[in-house]
Amino acid sequence: MYKVLVVAYYFPPIGLSGVQRTLKFVKYLPDFGWQPTVITTGKIAYFAYDETLLNEIKDKNINIIRVGAKDVNALLGKLGTKKPPREKIRKVLNRISQSIFIPDNKKSWSKKAARKIEELLDKEHFDLIFVTGPPFSAFVEIAELKIKRNIPVVYDYRDLWYESYFSFYLTPGHKFRHYKYEYFALKNVNKITVTNRKIKEKLLLDFPFLKHTDITIIRHGYDAEDFEKTPPIAKENNKLLIVHSGNFIEYTTPEFMLQALRDLQLKYPDVAADLEFHFIGIMDKKYQKLIKKYKLELIVKTYGYMEHKEAVRKVKSADVLWFMIGRKKNIDAILPGKLFEYIGAKKPIFGSVPDGAAKSVLEEYEASFISEPDNVEQITETLVEIYNLYKDNNLPVPYSKYVEKHERRVLTEELSKVFQFLLKE
């Protein structure tokens, strides 16, 4: 059995979809000859916790080493789950943080994690280090460690770093420092995995020393076990049920969908009366106020954050799932893991998205409806189209082979092959 160190700040019991990719890799890597040891954060304050996620690997003999630090979340850790700030406040705090901490505010943790890895390497042999980002400060620290120790390293880009859809640069100097850090990190890595082709293309464009063969695309996926072992929540009626699972953050908003539902009530009252829209996840108060303002209480129900297992049950109960990405710079490179949880449910998906990686996935999935993210009239008419197909029992079905290739075990086997080929070089 080969041994791999997995460096991941975001890991259970932290909740939300960002931890799923790494958790599932760790869960299935032993099936392909790789025993992971996880280096992750200690007790921190975070928007959501899901203690049940660790149950997935409790019988896998996975060593999880928790490294504390002095980042803001760690200092608030005694509070446990923290309430997310309102969107305007969150944006301000995020910009302040990005102006002070380069490459990110997890630098303290990343340095401590690297020191812990050095201690481990002094005691036992590991074949490879796998680092997932963000936080990208972990890439920098592991790059420095690689120079010292000459151990093979693989970076996993869950999102873009330089000029990402999340980035804010106070000055050109801030922007240059980010580029310099990423340049250094990429000069000291063996292989790279990314979640979609757009990220790969941007890395190759921004860092011309990289070769196509340096970067492997391993998309997000779904765990078949999550869906096979989890029964759906029974529907309360025969109305068309559309479900959205996930939080609304900087590049997503329910605003245009809520406007479309308002217009649906005015233009197509019979359709609106025979439809329900359920939101799972943290929703800003301003959107909850819109629900009341538009008098949507009979159509829209909000459920707040659910543990992953319960969220899967709710997703399975839906007739159609809604997915949204707004307009932002380089947004074409974003491909949230939530979309592949939807694919795992094998339900029709209504995507309100711009051109980009997510739209391509929806088109390949086939059981999809696509609108512009902010075209309220188009969203309204698409809802009517979906409703009519539902009443005719003629909703589209997904392309089965496309669904199967995004199963987590299949994707983890792809990752194990990246590891194996690296060791042979």
Annotate each language-model stretch with its function:
Residues 137-140, 144-148, 173-194:
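Membrane-proximal helix-turn-helix segments that form the acceptor-binding/catalytic region
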Residues 149-154, 163-184, 224:
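Nucleotide-sugar donor phosphate/pyrophosphate-binding loop at the beta->alpha transition
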Residues 198, 218-221:
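Carbohydrate-associated surface elements
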Residues 234-252, 258-261, 411:
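Conserved donor-binding/catalytic core segment of Leloir-type glycosyltransferases
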Residues 272-281, 286-312:
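Nucleotide-activated donor-binding/catalytic signature segment of Leloir-type glycosyltransferases, i.e.
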Residues 374-378, 391-421:
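A charged, aromatic-enriched C-terminal amphipathic alpha-helix characteristic of glycosyltransferases
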